[in-house]
Design a protein with these regions (language model features):
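Low-complexity, highly charged intrinsically disordered N-terminal segments
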Residues: 2-7
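N-terminal ordered "arm"
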Residues: 8-66
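A broadly used, surface-exposed interaction patch
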Residues: 42, 46-93, 98
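Structured loops at beta-to-helix junctions and adjacent beta-edge loops in soluble globular domains
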Residues: 62, 87, 108-110, 185, ...
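Short loop/turn segments at secondary-structure transitions that flank enzyme active sites
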Residues: 65-67, 90-92, 111-113, 188, ...
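Compact, glycine/acidic-enriched structural inserts
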Residues: 82, 86-144
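Hydrophobic, aromatic-lined core segments that form the binding pocket/scaffold
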Residues: 151-395, 408
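Cysteine-cluster motifs in flexible loop/terminal segments that predominantly coordinate metals
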Residues: 394-422
Length: 422
């Protein structure tokens, strides 16, 4: 058992309103108070009747009475106004700073066996994927509807926090933020962080100045990534190298120390190809940030990302080996991921900075997008969970990462719904 189960019992009023303390005194709960998620006692502003005396103050909870001393509450001023100590097992008398006994309520024996059985079955039992996997699909649709929207807003807020940190680091330049986020997406799982560091390290004003020179832009990105060959007999790589040396001198560039990987990637996802595509994206689109604020459907975004690679990369994946000529456009799946992981959180953070809440319109936007495909989503589908759009997948990913993995069932509407059944 975990302490959060005691919080659940108190918060959702699963404790008898009329009972007795460990001393045998009569206890009547007039108000359970408000849950406190910050430091200090677990519940504040509770109202109790102990014997004939009415009390108002805080309630603290532990699995055992002795944990009061384990946590050092006896010397903490924040706990001086505790009027009730709620425990699962009363194993020791507890005294306040004035050496007065603190009224204690032992819950063991007061909770219905059915509720305990549901708790043990759902939260503490062995499972393969998530704790509620056997009962997930039995949760009422109305519960899921409100919970899913809350999860999505949580996810938007979480991503907006990261965007805002990037915005501050970029001296409040939204174009630079977009550039960094696009680099991370183009880098994918393998090179995302390395590409992000490239973006952070590079002065975006150079991209603005050089975007009308395709060779310069590609040389800049490949050179900063450390991907240009030191020696080559091929004409195009030599041109890139020459242009990069020129840009190095012109802008006094220093390349960040990052490790770019090819291993484990399909050729279409090689960093050389991705950086060439990104260079072409910026060559063909001036003021890209203002454009992404306007697009909200896949067709428009696909048109924006209708770019390829420079001629050399049509017959190469690396600088050393020629390959069959293949059109290397940005795939629909990558465009969808960029829409979900770049455009949506960036729009949310941008409009939030202007004091506007666009969460509802972004939720509707996500509901028009194709569902993502990954191992976590597949496992939810195997439970019988319906996954139709990116809204569904984003909700499930947020739930899995922040609730299921850490077994926060008692903070989850699904877990509470299952536990609360009669």
């Amino acid at each position: 058992m975990k302490e959060d189960f005691l919080h659940y019992l108190w918060k959702y009023k699963k404790v008898p309103l009329n009972t007795v303390l460990t001393t045998g005194e009569r206890l009547q709960i007039l108000s359970f108070g408000e849950y406190n998620s910050l430091s200090g006692p677990d519940f504040q502003s509770a109202q109790l009747l102990i014997g004939e005396q009415q009390w108002a103050g805080n309630v603290e909870m532990h699995l055992k009475s002795s944990h009061w001393y384990v946590h050092g509450h006896e010397s903490d001023p924040a706990y001086r106004n505790v009027i009730l100590h709620v425990v699962w097992e009363h194993d020791i008398e507890v005294f306040d700073a004035n050496n007065q006994p603190i009224p204690t309520l032992e819950l063991q024996g007061l909770i219905s066996p059915e509720l305990l059985e549901r708790y043990n079955t759902t939260v503490t039992s062995h499972y393969q994927f998530i704790p509620c996997e056997k009962e997930y699909t039995t949760v009422p649709a109305i519960t899921l509807l409100s919970w899913n929207e809350r999860l999505l807003v949580e996810r938007l807020e979480e991503k907006a926090t990261a965007v805002n940190e990037l915005w501050k680091a970029a001296n409040f330049d939204w174009e630079k933020v977009l550039f960094c986020m696009l680099l991370k997406s183009f880098g994918g799982t393998v090179n995302g962080e390395a590409f992000l560091q490239l973006g952070k390290h590079l002065d975006f004003s150079i991209i603005r100045k050089e975007r009308s020179h395709p060779l310069h832009l590609e040389a800049l990105l490949l050179g900063q990534a450390g991907l240009l060959p030191e020696e080559t007999e091929l004409t195009y790589p030599r041109e890139l190298l020459r242009n990069y040396y020129y840009l190095q001198q012109k802008y006094k560039l220093s390349a960040p120390v990052v490790k770019i990987h090819f291993t484990g990637l399909r050729p279409q996802g090689f960093p050389t190809i991705r950086l060439s595509q990104l260079a072409q994206l910026y060559e063909l689109n001036e003021g890209l940030f203002s454009q992404i604020l306007e697009v909200n459907d896949f067709k428009s975004i696909q048109k924006l990302f209708a770019v390829g690679v420079s001629e050399f990369w049509e017959t190469h994946y690396t600088f050393t080996k020629t390959s069959k000529k293949v059109k290397k456009s940005i795939s629909a799946s990558l465009i969808t991921l960029i829409w979900i992981n770049v455009f949506i959180p960036l729009k949310y953070a941008y409009y939030q900075s202007l004091g506007k809440d666009v969460s509802e319109s972004l939720i509707e936007e996500l509901k028009t997008m194709t569902a993502e495909s990954n191992s976590i989503i597949t496992q939810y589908q195997q439970l019988g969970v319906s996954v139709a759009t990116a809204f569904d997948t984003q909700v499930l990913l947020q739930q899995y990462k922040h609730y299921c993995q850490s077994k926060r069932c008692l903070d989850c509407a699904i877990g509470i719904s299952i536990l609360g059944r009669k």
